[in-house]
Amino acid sequence: SQRQDLLSDASADNDLLTGAGGEPIPAGPREAIETYRKILETYPNYERNDQVLYQMSRAYDEIGQPDEAMKVMDRLVAEYPYSKYIDEVHFRRGEYYFVRKKYFDAESAYGAIITMGSTSSYYELALYKLGWALYKQELYEDAPHRYMAMLEQRQSVGYDCGENPEESEEHRVTDTFRVVSLSFSNLGGPEVVDEYFDEHGHRSYADKIYGNLGEFYFSKLRYEDAASVYKSFINH
């Protein structure tokens, strides 16, 4: 049947997205996009059209057309909110907005994943990027909450913030402590850190928050502030 032919073409085109050596074949993604478009037009009620849209968006990314990929992802989000691809798609949308400095829109996309809960494999990464989206909007009071939530999530699955994680994770955790310290610095300094932990409870990684803030002040030659941070930590 025509439908089976189209689906066979789509399957074949999926295989063309990358060559045997992992290198993209220039004609492959474009051919795939046309096949996906035919499926969507001819069979609008096909039960796997969320997968068709997902593959179509990836194909647009393959040929360097992120704006077109975004249009397809927006359609997937609108028409298939419970698709198995939805959290990845929300994250990719968040990244699209973030690199274009549309931080409010990025906040919304990352937030959609957090609403889904910790069962999403993108949950922790979304917390991290949401913290950055808030920080970029100068929402310094909100950003630390998201970062702390990310650290809490890591600890809940047995991760020790004091241990040596894998390189990519180490960068994320180190960056988290750094931007939390920057947020507190923008809010006023050591007394703000004290108030935060007094209000929200002590954290096992509080020493790293104080330490990073102290190092930040020291690097800026703000020696009195640095000393004040270390004194606050000792007193807490």
Outline where the language-model segments fall.
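Acidic, polar-rich low-complexity tracts and alpha-helical solenoid repeat scaffolds
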Residues: S1-H236
